[in-house]
């Protein structure tokens, strides 16, 4: 795994620094920091989502630092400049369990010399990690803010089953089979991202990685005029297929092909309100 240097100052706002913290649950953890000049400040930990980085928080960090906090945003396990995880498709995925992400956060907090965190805030996938941090160690993570992804709570244990026969479980691939059998065959984007070709599809996309990601984020943002959220009635293939193709893709298209028809023009980008 290639070890990259810290981010250069010219790509960061003044007052935000990039560095590495070593030996964090087996990781060489890349972090961004603000408000580090003054010792003893309460700690705020910011956890990014997918597909994002610590860099996503750069414009949030300075206002929090100005409010008197030390603000730290790591590249989570599997992302960015952080190394020490198994990046092979056929590698061991055990280290990516959510409770191990909590250990990563705890290790970082301890390495920075803190015994508690004033606030852990998470966006998207980071919201799940933040929620579990607060659930598992409320003595450390004193408050929590969740953005974009709601937390349903810990798994519910089977109840009153000693004298009652267990109910058969639905097959895990049921929804995927439903989507694939629609008149317009579809697939869930998370299933696609778990397949072997997905990484190469995006790295080698015809648009180029930068343009593809710019189009992908535009497609998912409020700047894309087709985004008109509405509640789904139930968890069925037909109902899920009402969602945009960045969520429920056409079965035989990869994500680069999915984004290609909605790539933003220069005028679209110039008029963006949600993405700078």
Where are these regions (language model features)?
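Short beta-strand element of the alpha/beta-hydrolase
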Residues: 40-48
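A short loop-to-beta-strand scaffold at the N-terminal edge of the catalytic core in hydrolase folds
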Residues: 24-34
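Core alpha-helical elements of the protein kinase catalytic domain
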Residues: 55, 62, 106-110
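Serine-hydrolase catalytic-loop signature spanning alpha/beta hydrolases and amidase-signature enzymes
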Residues: 51-59, 71
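Short glycine/proline-centered loop/turn elements that form peptide/ligand docking sites
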Residues: 59, 63, 150
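Flexible "cap/lid" subdomain of the alpha/beta-hydrolase fold that forms the substrate-access gate
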Residues: 2-18, 29, 43, 79-121, ...
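Conserved alpha/beta-hydrolase "nucleophile elbow" surrounding the catalytic nucleophile
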Residues: 48-50, 122-123
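Conserved alpha/beta-hydrolase
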Residues: 63-86
């Amino acid at each position: 795994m290639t070890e990259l240097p810290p981010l250069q100052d010219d790509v960061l706002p003044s007052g935000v620094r990039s560095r590495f913290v070593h030996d964090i649950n087996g990781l060489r953890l890349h972090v961004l920091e603000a408000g580090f000049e003054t010792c003893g400040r309460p700690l705020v930990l910011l956890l990014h989502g997918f597909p994002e980085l610590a860099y996503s928080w750069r414009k949030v960090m300075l206002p929090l630092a100005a409010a008197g906090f030390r603000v730290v945003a790591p590249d989570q396990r599997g992302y960015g400049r952080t190394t020490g995880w198994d990046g092979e498709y056929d590698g061991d995925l055990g280290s990516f369990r959510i409770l191990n992400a909590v250990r990563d956060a705890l290790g970082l907090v301890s390495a920075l010399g803190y015994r508690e965190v004033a606030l852990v805030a998470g966006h998207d996938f980071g919201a799940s990690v933040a929620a579990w941090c607060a659930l598992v160690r409320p003595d450390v993570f004193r408050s929590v803010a969740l953005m974009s992804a709601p937390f349903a709570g810990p798994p519910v244990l089977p109840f009153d089953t000693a004298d009652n026969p267990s109910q058969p479980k639905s097959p895990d691939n049921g929804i995927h089979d439903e989507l694939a059998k629609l008149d317009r065959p579809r697939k869930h984007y998370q299933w696609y991202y778990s397949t072997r070709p997905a990484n190469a599809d995006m790295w080698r996309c015809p648009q180029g990685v930068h343009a593809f990601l710019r189009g992908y984020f535009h497609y998912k943002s409020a700047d894309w005029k087709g985004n008109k959220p509405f509640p789904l009635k139930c968890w069925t293939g037909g109902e899920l297929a009402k969602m945009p193709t960045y969520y429920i893709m056409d079965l035989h298209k990869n994500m680069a092909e999915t984004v290609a028809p909605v790539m933003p023009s220069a005028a679209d980008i110039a008029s963006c309100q949600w993405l700078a």
